[in-house]
Structures are given as structure tokens and as C-alpha cells.
């Protein structure tokens, strides 16, 4: 039997406010346990929550960026459940009327054969809520500690429709969402610190069946790799269970990175289990149209719009445009290079950023803003490749590494001169070298003339070797073909 995978994601993005959503306490990460917990966070008697305007504004920003409806009136609700790190016995969230309704995110997904396809993921909602505290199970022998520093931190919970059909699509969506919230500046996106974490609702059904299968929710996935591994394992587990004649039970499960397996944590609750009701301590949230328009006017150019512009203005592929706009800083670096190098170098600039520059950044674990080679320096190197001063191969192998290491202050011209890397410009000298190569490789000449194209590549290699890589490959090709008839 053929199976179809159905996936929906719920993502918690910690909003980048300086204070908590219902109190003035700091949200800074890493403070000593319980030093950033106000009377509101501790649920002491007689205290009342006060809504943080900055959290609302960030939710509006997100809603506008995904083309959603901003609810003119939304309501906060109490989500009731008991857990040691939730002092009130309920979480303040939104249920019936969320602040952000609908919206879409378009993603680029890599298929099984390496091709890319585009897909639009529909969002159900995004709502404001407070985070819970943290249970520390490993810090005390035989006991659990509670740290309430995180309690009350503002979250935007972003919920999709069950639109994704593979782990690859889920990861592509999560990456696109992560890129967007960081781009907007509403979340720092630090997955290690829990600022961006995903829950994946996964089910399977026979191909062609309209009804959804029974879903299991994988909680608190804080890396894209874990998200992919967890979904892939869960899908295979569910298929095996069904094919063995067992029914899937709705449940909340955890992913164990050490074993690569999911395991059931508890029976999955439905909304009625949380006994939602409007929070009597908070007035309905009223958002004036003028406020929405002020936020809209202040939005930066969004990734989707910039991607479309890169395709039309620079002639890039949709994949290249998506990669270059992964972060605002990366996109700005690219545009700075093109501004100096000229539009004719738009595609080479993209190739260099996605190739050699990204490789160095990943190798050293640094961001593009910290790259030792600045846009103007890379633009000069591209200009030297374009005007034939150095070959692309020499630039990659010799010039760029020296620039990255700071030799000659990263100046391409100085490095080329100091290392004697300039391509041969004397066509007479190159012609003599090619004559010598042809004379010394009579067998390859004969094979080429008998129709073996590989022999030509061997001759090119010999010519480049004889010039110690200083010849222009295009010129070598041209002269060889001319002499070989």
C-alpha cells in the first residue's frame, strides 16, 4: 500500500521584547535562576497582568509579512493545566480570536532528484501567549528544580494547516519561517536557547484517502536536523504499526536525539481538556487600523519581495534568490558586491557567496558581518576575473584564501602581483607553449582527430600545466581547436 504523509507545524517564536508579555521583568537569557521572576510571574495574590505593547506590535509585523488578517479585536484566554513550572495553574494565551488569522509562506523544497519545487504553506493563525518556566531535572539528585525566569516571556505561536507532505517540506517551511522572523527582527531565532522551537503534528493515510489519519504531536524540536529526523522516524513507525494491524493512538511524543527515535510522553489532549475561557483580568485587545498602517509603513523589504526582485533584476534562479535572502545581512552583502562589481557580475557574485564565502563562514562558524573579506574587496576580485587578469580557478585556489587571511590588507591586486598570479597576456608565448604540448602529445592529438573528445580535455590540462595555471582557459581552448583544425 502507498502512504501519504500529512504534517502540520506549531512553532513558538520568542518575541524580542526587553520585558515580559504581562510584566516589566527582563527577558534576558542566562540570568541566575529565579532572579527574573516578578510577582506576576510567580502568581502571587493580588497582582494583575499588564499587556506589553511591543509584543502586540511584533505580532502585527508578522501578520502583515505573511499577508494575514490582523484581528481588530482579539481576546486572551486561560489555558488550564497543572505543571510545576506553571505557578498560576493556567497559561495566558489566545484561543477563539487570535490576533493573526490566515496568511501564507512560500517555500523552495529540494526533491528526491535534487530538483527544486515551490510550494505554498497556508497558516491557520498566530497568537500571543506567555511561556512557562523551566523544570531542571538533572541539576538536583532525586529532585526537580524550577526556574521561573522564562515564565511570562512573550511567545508568538504560529500554526499551519496540515499542508506538508514530507519531512523535507516541513524543514523547508521551518527554515523559511525562521528566516522571516529573524529578518523582521521580532525574534532572535536562537534555537539553542529555545527562542525558536517546533512541534510537529504527524499522521499517515493511504494515498487517495480524504480523511486524515490519527496524528501524534512531536514536541519541542529545537533544530532543523532533529525536526527532519523526528518526522522521518515517526512516519516509518506509524506505517509499521498500521501494517502490523495496530491502531495509532493520539499522543504527545518526544524525540530522543541519541537514539533517533520518538517515544510517547502522554495521551494527546484536545482543546476541551484545557477548559479555555476568557481571561477576566485582561481587556479585549483592540487594534486600530491606523496602528496597523503605521506598522506596515515601517516594514523592511520582505524576503519574498526581495527574492522576486533578485530574479527579475539580476537574472538569478529562484533557488539562488532564496539562498541569498536567508538573512538580511547576507542579502545586504550580496547587493553591496553587485553595486561595486556591476550587474554583469550578479551571477558570479551569487556563485561566490553561495560557494567559497559560505564555505569559509561555515568552517569558521562566523556570520557574514564578521567575514574578513568585505564586499568591495570581493567585487574587485570579480572584476579581475572578468577582465582576464586571473582565472576563476586561480582566484579560488590562490587569491581568495590570501584575501581571507588578510594578506596585503585583503587587496586582490596586491596579492596577484606579489604572488605572480597574473594570467598570460602574450598570445605569441601561449601559442608557442601549445605547439610544444601538441608535439609532446601526439597520441592525444591522434585520438582527438579520430573523434575522442576526452583527448581534447587532456590537451587542455597539459597546456594549463605548462603555463602553471596562468593561461586563460578560454584562450587555451580557442588556440587548441584552431591548431587541431
UniProtKB/Swiss-Prot annotation:
GO annotation (BP), single: translation
Any Pfam family: GatB_N
Superkingdom to which the source organism belongs: Bacteria
UniProt-listed InterPro entries: Asn/Gln-tRNA_amidoTrfase_suB/E, Asn/Gln-tRNA_Trfase_suB/E_cat, Asn/Gln_amidotransferase, Asn/Gln_tRNA_amidoTrase-B-like, GatB, GatB_C_1, GatB_Yqey_C_2, Gln-tRNA_amidoTrfase_suB_CS
Keywords linked to the UniProt accession: ATP-binding, Ligase, Nucleotide-binding, Protein biosynthesis
GO function term, MF aspect, one: ATP binding
EC number assigned by the record: 6.3.5.-
Recorded catalytic activity of this chain's protein: L-glutamyl-tRNA(Gln) + L-glutamine + ATP + H2O = L-glutaminyl-tRNA(Gln) + L-glutamate + ADP + phosphate + H(+); L-aspartyl-tRNA(Asn) + L-glutamine + ATP + H2O = L-asparaginyl-tRNA(Asn) + L-glutamate + ADP + phosphate + 2 H(+)
NADP keyword on record: no
Record-linked SMART domains: GatB_Yqey
Function statement: Allows the formation of correctly charged Asn-tRNA(Asn) or Gln-tRNA(Gln) through the transamidation of misacylated Asp-tRNA(Asn) or Glu-tRNA(Gln) in organisms which lack either or both of asparaginyl-tRNA or glutaminyl-tRNA synthetases. The reaction takes place in the presence of glutamine and ATP through an activated phospho-Asp-tRNA(Asn) or phospho-Glu-tRNA(Gln).
Subunit structure, interactors included: Heterotrimer of A, B and C subunits.
Family affiliation: Belongs to the GatB/GatE family. GatB subfamily.
Name recorded for this polypeptide: Aspartyl/glutamyl-tRNA(Asn/Gln) amidotransferase subunit B
Origin species: Cupriavidus taiwanensis (strain DSM 17343 / BCRC 17206 / CCUG 44338 / CIP 107171 / LMG 19424 / R1)
Taxonomic lineage of the native organism: Bacteria, Pseudomonadati, Pseudomonadota, Betaproteobacteria, Burkholderiales
